[in-house]
């Protein structure tokens, strides 16, 4: 009940800068300093590493050490530049997942952060289906998504994702800026066939469309934490 009330309150704030203190799910990226709001987190998406394509395909760690998080559910995030993974990358990912869990973290899933082109979602779904088969049975699989998917995504590709991933977090920002006209994309969220969350930028603009809270696939928000601007 408390989570539902918080969700409704957050959705009701029009045109306000995103106040992280009103939310309970956060991304914490490399180079971003921890903030007091993390103490209220129920779900954390922590960047573990990045799969680079050059000079060779490899998983490069982005954290100095294995995290130790008490209480909050953890999603291990991997930023991906290529889907052509070598067997070594899969082994590295699974080994890191095991280390995070062995350290006492409640790791619920792996999130893949990849800028899949809107017209090639079917290919992305095939990669994700293969990855899912390699993950432990109790490990969920999530992805980040582009707002364009809701408006122009191939219906067959969206349906393929629905059979593979547990959630998509649709980001209304690129880099450190909110996408202009994001409301137009959100108006078409009825096309989404996968449970989804909305990714917000700390301090960025946000106005929830009236229909969002009633969407049966809407699961809440994730706030991308950012370092305060230097003065």
What are these regions (language model features)?
Residues 2-11:
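Sec-dependent N-terminal signal peptides
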